[in-house]
């Protein structure tokens, strides 16, 4: 049960050494004005102490220990100051010392190769002097010791089915390119970061890469403490099952009577310090016991953020991760050179399967812009012909028909064209998110947006439901294309969820090809300025209390209960490039005390969304309902610590462009196999030109990336925007058929479609690791490619886990200074 420090009680002890906040003195006075209200306090639902390193190995100490908070605050203060540095402290500048060293190394290698026949003894000595790295001999010795002790479990499990393809094998001693002390420090830090992510994923019942978990289990003193729930077993899918799931016998919104809903648990709900708590009685008082549901400890979260922030600017760790990423890129190029024709031959052997008829999911697309501009134009013209006299809008208390709305604009159906609609992004929207948002208004009129692409209006979202159903019909006709549409909940009023659910149920907006995500725009400052909200906690109550009520007593929100069965999770959206005037730390005001008109920072939104979602997931899992995941927009622009928060809390992210500047985070996202839905055409119009997009680089290194459309209304021209996205990417980056099918398979894996549906699309064994989990008859991805990805990931995980397991190095003294990039 959660314990809260009440009046007169001391606050829970902070797990790291207390230091004065650098922001308190370094940040501008106006950035802190009015935000000095009650600070954040520890709030924990699980009994007992919850230290950060609860299930870590005995020794994961590094040279950064004791300095994480100080280093993180320094980096936060740099981001607030908007430094004019040529490169950020977490990225590599263009003239990187590592690149210079690599060039020198290559020149020396060429010189040595020229002298090999003349002076073999000189060659040997030169190679030993130049390539000498402590990590080689130490790691080799460790391997020999491990074999001598009979510890063969990890190696035996890594034996995969032999696949007929050519592998690149580095013979001899392991070459990491860094001294062993740096290797061990980097390996410990990377492992510690992976443990942190695993902890938060388990806490919220989100997924974590099974391969990574298996390697981390070799290091943990004891298994991670998780809640287990009884689940009804899924009906197994046979190996010969059709690629199309069976059709539903009846519409999922058919029975909406409260009498058919699950029973009432009779539990009470109340939000305390920004998180909904569940009590054993309907009207809880101060002495009413709580239902024990776990959620993240706040002090522990801030400490974990500080650890990761300090990690990404550590010089030796950046060098290690940069080298590993470069190695992964080069290794993939060699793999393609050796096996491209074999992969193509394997694809050609599969009957009735090619890129067009494999499942692909648009994992990042907004419902309000899921149609293309021609589709919207035709729909508006059709509505003007058929429903001219329908009352669609209220202007200053006077009802208006569709005819009157267009007459007030001096427009007829004949006047309308794609150009007058003016919803497509152009060169004027680059780095201008405000102008891009204005493109959501057809003909520049917000009233048309309200009439045609809103769920809550005078006609109860009738037109929007019709156009969404037309898009769904197109997806069903294509058979193999699917989408996860984003619908908005703003948090301005408590009845938003019920209105949205009634819109979906009453208009029967459903398709087996579509799942929903709910996006929460980060617009508290706008609502607070207009006086619509008193504090940030009111916004959180409006977003989450209806969900808890529908879970505890489904009959009280029957439409919402049905609608939530088709919702995958939550998204956090807004312009990331907007400056943040506050840093989320222990001095930040609690949600009920956040009454200023400043917008809370990104991490603040994400933490409270995650904390409430974790509580909700455990409650829903107890009832046998499906759970939600967190899949925010992240890394499109703005500061790097957005990606740090998402690494800890999010199952997948959208965009992730800034990973190209942060080698440590990019390596962590690779090792954890975090899904990244990338939208190159969207980025090309807003933040990054197409040829600079890092998607092909991410794909070659093995990150879990997929292609998505984001906003077809603004960026695409054809009836099939997802195919348009694949087509342009293939032409510009010269992707192979295997690359395209791999992207499509990734999109299905990271999507929120049910396990049974994925079993039909990918094969009943898709959850298994490596080639055993691939069915080329359904995915058209050769086992060669899947085997290469799996073996490479295992080798990278083995490298860092073996280094941590090594006992050759004594404990690093805490007095050793860390190497940081130069400050401003």
UniProtKB/Swiss-Prot annotation:
Residues 1-43 are annotated as: Disordered. Keywords: Hydrolase, Metal-binding, Methylation, Nucleotide metabolism, Phosphoprotein, Zinc. Substrate binds at residues 366, 435-440, 636, 711-714. Zn(2+) binds at residues 364, 366, 633, 710. The modification Phosphotyrosine is found at residue 90. Belongs to the metallo-dependent hydrolases superfamily. Adenosine and AMP deaminases family. AMP deaminase plays a critical role in energy metabolism. Catalyzes the deamination of AMP to IMP and plays an important role in the purine nucleotide cycle. Its EC number is 3.5.4.6. GO terms for cellular component: cytosol. This is AMP deaminase 2. The keyword Zinc applies. The modification Phosphoserine is found at residues 21, 45, 63, 79, 96, 113, 135, 137. Binds 1 zinc ion per subunit. Pathway: Purine metabolism; IMP biosynthesis via salvage pathway; IMP from AMP: step 1/1. Its cofactor is Zn(2+). The modification Omega-N-methylarginine is found at residue 44. It comes from Rattus norvegicus (Rat). It holds the Pfam family AMP_deaminase. It catalyses: AMP + H2O + H(+) = IMP + NH4(+). InterPro entries: A/AMP_deam_AS, AMPD, Metal_Hydrolase. Residues 10-20 have a biased composition (Basic residues). Homotetramer. The modification Phosphothreonine is found at residue 133. It is an enzyme of class 3 (hydrolase). One of its GO terms (molecular function) is AMP deaminase activity.
